[in-house]
Amino acid sequence: MNQFTHINTNGEANMVDVSMKQETVRVARAEAFVSMNAETLQMIISGNHHKGDVFATARIAGIQAAKRTWELIPLCHPLLLSKVEVQLEALPETNQVRIESLCKLTGKTGVEMEALTAASVAALTIYDMCKAVQKDMVIENVRLLHKSGGKSGEFNAE
């Protein structure tokens, strides 16, 4: 079994030293879903929400969050991201919004946390913008879809 990389031999949390690691292209994709009533989803789709374009706001929030992950998650490294994408898709058949994020850089550590943070904050932004209309929305199934680059190789969710 692999060891936790952020815990030293004394059991103390520390930031991982990546100074001797090779720079490689790192890519990560993550997703999240927001489940809601059909009426709430239709309000988002039609653009009739009184706060404005929900998808545009959530997209920008997700991008901003990816760039600030190191400030939110203890022990994450500040990264020079070369690409952040946040895609939002309305799924009327399940009354959900699907969010997919992609983060990319050339560096010494991965971008999984940045991708997960982007998807999560985009979902939280949808909730925030729509909570006046519906408070029982559910943010669910936040997960890493893909990561590549680095010593640990490639990962693809099933």
From Swiss-Prot:
One of its GO terms (molecular function) is GTP 3',8'-cyclase activity. The keyword Transcription regulation does not apply. It holds the Pfam family MoaC. It catalyses: (8S)-3',8-cyclo-7,8-dihydroguanosine 5'-triphosphate = cyclic pyranopterin phosphate + diphosphate. Its EC number is 4.6.1.17. InterPro entries: MoaC, MoaC_bact/euk, MoaC_sf, MoCo_biosynth_MoaA/MoaC, Mopterin_CF_biosynth-C_dom. Belongs to the MoaC family. Catalyzes the conversion of (8S)-3',8-cyclo-7,8-dihydroguanosine 5'-triphosphate to cyclic pyranopterin monophosphate (cPMP). This is Cyclic pyranopterin monophosphate synthase. The gene is moaC.
